[in-house]
Amino acid sequence: MGICDPIHQLGMWDDFNSSFPSTSATMILEVDKCLEDQIPIMEKRLDNETEDTSHGTVGTSNRYEPETSKPVEKVLRRLAQNREAARKSRLRKKAYVQQLENSKLKLIQLEQELERARKQGMCVGGGVDASQLSYSGTASSGTAVFDMEYGHWVEEQTRQTNDLRIALHSQIGEAELRIIVDGYLNHYFDLFRMKATAAKADVLYIMSGMWKTSAERFFMWIGGFRPSELLKVLTPHLELLTEQQLREVCNLTQSCQQAEDALSQGMVKLHQILAEAVAAGRLGEGNYTLPQMGPAIEKLEDLVRFVNQADHLRQETLQQMSRILNTCQAAQGLLALGEYFERLRVLSSQWATRLREPT
């Protein structure tokens, strides 16, 4: 079973005003001025030559006309080409400057959102001691970005769920519905890629489910939903399944359960090994150095692979269900899945409100 391991990089733009050469603009202006000075002279010279030709003999005009007109036309054509090249160069420079400015604004906005998310994380974790804060500060930069991206992901999922609901009620064409279904699936795949990046920054944060609501955390399995359980949730909402489809859904559910059992057994074994590694220190030392905690840290790195494998199983399950079902059935299943998570989030909100009410 493969492991999804995307790599995200964030490039930094250098300051354009301090690095972009200013001489190019001056050169362009000088070329324009030179062209503007030369064109009237050329036009006047052509007028004089035309006047002289009109007063001269016909034989002389016919004799020297090819030699005179060809160089002049060539020069004028070259001057026109130079002016057009200078104009295009100015337009390219203007577009490049605008692109740099837009990139700077986006980068500043991202840094501001990241700083706000980091401050919010510090407020939420205000109950821990200073040593925990100093440790979590090194890992929170990656998880803060994930928190911000996941918040946007939930908002987009809510919008896509509403679009899917409207599409099913309006009975649009199958081709249009397939576009919506594929977009909904890709939205889940984006989440798996986001989680893979965040797990490398702090896998325990992903495993803890602190980025989800309390009701969602209650049903979590290795950093996300259990595929076989969600198949049971959405299958009753599918209409007119054929016998072949029912068999394939049943086989898929059994395959998911077997894969889940294998991963769960591996997690139990990893839990035992990690506990033994942490407890391996001598009694009374009190000085927990990095070499002493090295074996435990290596086991936490193994935990990243478990999270990625679990997400890979979730992605494969969604893809297989999309293959088994027709377009309308797939839309119904994804709508049931989206509304299920919406109900869990509403349940968490209502439960939290109930706890704040006076008894």
Swiss-Prot record:
Region described as Basic motif: 74-94
Subcellular location: Nucleus
Biased composition range(s): Basic and acidic residues: 44-54
Keyword Magnesium carried by entry: no
PROSITE patterns attached to this UniProt entry: BZIP, BZIP_BASIC, DOG1
Single GO BP term: DNA-templated transcription
Residue stretches in coiled coil: 73-125
Pfam entry (one): DOG1
SUPFAM superfamilies named among the record's database cross-references: Leucine zipper domain
GO molecular function term, any single one: DNA-binding transcription factor activity
Domain bZIP residue range list: 72-135
Region of interest (Leucine-zipper), ranges: 100-114
Disordered, as annotated region: 44-72
Record key words, sorted: Activator, Coiled coil, DNA-binding, Nucleus, Transcription, Transcription regulation
GO terms for cellular component: nucleus
Domain (DOG1): residue spans on this chain: 143-354
SS bond partners: none
Family note: Belongs to the bZIP family.
Role according to the record: Transcriptional activator that binds specifically to the DNA sequence 5'-TGACG-3'. Recognizes ocs elements like the as-1 motif of the cauliflower mosaic virus 35S promoter. Binding to the as-1-like cis elements mediate auxin- and salicylic acid-inducible transcription. Could also bind to the Hex-motif (5'-TGACGTGG-3') another cis-acting element found in plant histone promoters.
PANTHER family hit by this protein: TRANSCRIPTION FACTOR TGA4, TRANSCRIPTION FACTOR TGA9
Subunit structure: Binds DNA as a dimer.
UniProt name for this protein: TGACG-sequence-specific DNA-binding protein TGA-1A
Origin species: Nicotiana tabacum (Common tobacco)
Lineage start: Eukaryota, Viridiplantae, Streptophyta, Embryophyta, Tracheophyta
